[in-house]
Amino acid sequence: MFAKADTIPNTEKLFENSNGIAIWGTIGKHLGFVTNIRDSREWGTRQYPGVINFSREGLGFAQGGPDYLEHDETVAYLVANWNHLTLQFGKDKNQWGPGRFGQLALSTRPTSYDQIKLQYATDRLRFTFLLAQLQHYNDHTYFYGARKSKILVGHRLEIAPFSRLTFSFYEMMVHAGNNIEWAYLNPVMFFRSADHYLGDRDNAGMGGDFTARLPLSSRIYGEVLIDDISTRRLGSGFYANRYAWLIGMDMADVFKMQNFDLCMEYTRIRPFTYSHERDIDYRHFTTNLGHWLGPNSDLIALKMTYQVSQPMIIQMTFGRLRHGDNPLNANIGGNILQPWGVNGQPTNVEFLEGVLKKADLVTCMIKYEPLRNFNLRAEYVYSRDTIAELTRNELTLFFCVNP
């Protein structure tokens, strides 16, 4: 991969080389396996941390120097199925939620993590129980001996009462340490009640989403995540009202143009959402498990996708992002690393309070597969900070051979 980013003060060049191996298959009628190992090295004129061991957004453990970094990504798991039951054990990612630009509960942005996942599925119902081990870091640096682990446990119930309508409800719990409480191993336990029973020591969250299929090959969808909430002060700026929601709509074959798809989505995340006052915030390494926007932010986005032919796809994305950042020596909930009580303790925080940042985003991507499993991709990203009046242009050229 080759990338070139042009900013106001300078121009930087970035190169990345990835290689690996992927093996998958089945053993008998009920057992399957996947092993996908990829090792990557990135270098260029970009400024790197200059430390041997560290972590970065979207990555796990990384190593590097002043002008490069190296990291690997591994997905490896066994899966067994019998009638309506599926059991998966290994290292993988998860996606909970219908969002097209990001998911509030679990997204695929963090690196993969070790997990056990049990699913029961029928035509109208699917139940998922997830138990996973996460890695915790207080910042983007890493030192030997400073590693901490935490446990993620969650369950999700999806119901389709009608062929065109699906509802889902879920709970998540982050628990410190390597040992899991027995109460969280109960798939039908209400985790928030279990947390109260155990002394309110863990980080609980819950939510739901829906998808409704409409005529003209379209659908609407939405999701709500409740990190914490005070029903008596609902609708106010009370700091403990930590929640997020998104709403979207997508359409296929828009304007009767075959293979031309359109998607519109709005996401809104309250201050302090995803953060926690102990080492059980909602992150794996240094990456948010949920939406990449982070707290005290919103995004409105439009995506157009046109499949010109079988091997060629053109995609354009337009978006406007707003974020309320923490002022110096104050905490208004704009940083997942700073929970309530750090740098002051405001009891009332309005949405987008703080140092307001706005950005306009435009992305154009062309993907072409001239030969089977040989992919070419060119991507151009334009972003403009409307407050600071800074512009960034980024061009990425990607070459990939997949088995």
Segments from the language model and where they lie:
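Outer-membrane beta-barrel channel domains
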Residues: 1-166, 177, 234-243, 250-268, ...
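Exposed, low-structure sequence patches enriched in small/polar residues
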Residues: 71, 161-173, 178-403
